[in-house]
Amino acid sequence: KVLLNQMPIAIKNSKIDITQEESTKELATNFAYYLKGGEIIFLYGEMGVGKTTFVRYLINEFQKKEKIPLTEVTSPTFNLLNEYRLNNLIIKHYDLFRLKHELEIKDLDIFENSKSSVTLIEWPQLINKEKLIKTIDLSFVYENELNNRTVKIKGLS
């Protein structure tokens, strides 16, 4: 279990078992209390490994904190972006699965980031991260012949 008071330690570099969906929810809940705005979270991993599930729990936890009704959170595969406006925070959820070239990313204004937003990006492989700050990488992985799932956390850079 990742405890709230351990979150900054977990952010540095750790691998967490999320085989049980409840563990994914707990991790997302902890992240919701850690993130303040301005962060960019890159979500890596195969289809179905838990990226969107993590995002759903994270956004719903932000909504609970702000006492906003929970909304359905789906992957923005076709429209590329779903935005969730909370009281003082905007969560931008991108899914870049369909993009094939780095040039397509420039039109999305992904990095028009501010301290009032948290940006979540699924399938970020085409992004050049060199000049970005406040990034967190979440790498979701199947293990033991697809029976288990883990997430490796790396950041803040």
Label for each model-derived stretch:
Residues 101-105, 111-157:
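Short phosphate-coordinating micro-motif centered on Lys-Gly-acidic
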Residues 73-91:
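AAA+/P-loop NTPase substrate/partner-engagement loops
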Residues 60-72:
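Post-Walker A helix-loop "phosphate-sensing" segment adjacent to the P-loop in P-loop NTPases
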Residues 51:
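Conserved lysine of the Walker
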Residues 46:
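P-loop (Walker A) phosphate-binding loop of NTP-binding proteins
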Residues 41-43:
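Hydrophobic anchor at the beta1->P-loop junction of P-loop NTPases
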Residues 8-28:
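N-terminal pre-Walker A segment at the start of P-loop NTPase domains
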